[in-house]
Regions:
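Conserved N-terminal catalytic core of the sugar/cofactor nucleotidyltransferase
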Residues: 2-5, 13, 27, 31-108, ...
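Cofactor-binding loop segments of dinucleotide-utilizing enzymes, especially the Rossmann-like FAD-
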Residues: 8, 53-54, 109, 136, ...
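Short alpha-helical oligomerization interface
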Residues: 19-23
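Catalytic-core segments of class I nucleotidyltransferases/pyrophosphorylases
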Residues: 46, 104-105, 112, 118-125, ...
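A short, conserved acidic/glycine-rich loop-to-beta-strand motif
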Residues: 127-137
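Short beta-strand-to-turn element immediately C-terminal to the catalytic PLP-Schiff-base lysine
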Residues: 145-147
């Protein structure tokens, strides 16, 4: 399996730490977020990874050249910040070069978790979904809506009102963890261009009948480390990230 680490963001929530470094190089207990994520992916047997970069991209490239993670790591440099969907579409070549239907993992660099990625992958393969999202039942301003079959059917709007793309009477709000398994056939269905969120693509395709599935992972540790508060919490929660994250 191959993977993409989304690391191109400006890291505005982590300022001033990201004034002089990309957020992927922010450290927890002496280890960069990028190292933690790469090590975790490798522990699940992933050895081919592409990382997108924009803010201070040269520093990220230098870092990867100076550290050997025992993996093939490509960098997708974005002159313009493309958001999650645009960034993935730009990196499509990396997944297409396999010439197979092998699904791939997409993982935000600014989340730490103990989510079982093998379980997520297995669920994806068995369900036949176009994408499978790790989700939790927690409060967030950006909840997605899933029907009784745990298939995407909408999202909460800025005023906390449901915005449904499928005619569902029963739905539940769940928080996306920034970790998902995707089938490469999604690239042929990506009509969006330029800067766009992968959630925009998911919602459009769900409205067309594509199966965008959820796997609840409430029993696993998860932490957003894209804020100073989250970073501090993670630092206190872990004494050995190599065994926990």
């Amino acid at each position: 399996m191959r993977a993409m680490i989304l690391a191109a963001g400006l890291g505005t929530r982590l300022r001033p730490l990201t004034h002089d470094r990309p957020k992927a190089l922010v450290e927890i207990n002496g280890r960069t977020l990028l190292e933690i994520t790469l090590t975790r992916l490798r522990s699940f047997g992933i050895h081919d990874v592409i990382v997108n970069a924009h803010h201070l991209a040269g520093m990220l490239v230098d870092y990867l050249q100076q550290h050997d993670f025992g993996m093939r790591i490509e960098v997708s440099r974005e002159d313009e910040l493309l958001d999650t969907g645009g960034g993935l579409k730009k990196a499509a070549w990396f997944f297409r070069e396999q010439g197979t239907d092998e699904p791939f993992l997409v993982h935000n660099v600014d989340v730490l978790s103990a989510i079982d990625l093998q379980r997520l992958t297995r669920q994806h393969r068995e369900s036949g979904a176009l994408a499978t999202l790790a989700v939790q039942r927690r409060d967030t301003s950006r909840q997605l809506l899933f029907d009784t079959r745990l298939e995407l059917c909408g999202r909460k709007t800025g005023d906390n009102e449901p915005e449904l793309v499928c005619p569902e009477e029963a739905f539940q709000p769940l928080a996306f963890c920034g970790i998902h398994i995707i089938s490469p056939r999604i690239f042929a269905r990506m009509s969006e261009e330029g800067v766009f969120s992968i959630i925009t693509t998911y919602l459009r395709l769900a409205a067309l009948g594509e199966k965008i599935a959820a796997l609840p992972v409430d029993e696993y540790y998860w932490r957003d480390v894209g804020t100073p508060e989250g970073l501090a919490e993670a630092t206190n929660e872990f004494t050995d990230l190599s065994s926990s994250a």
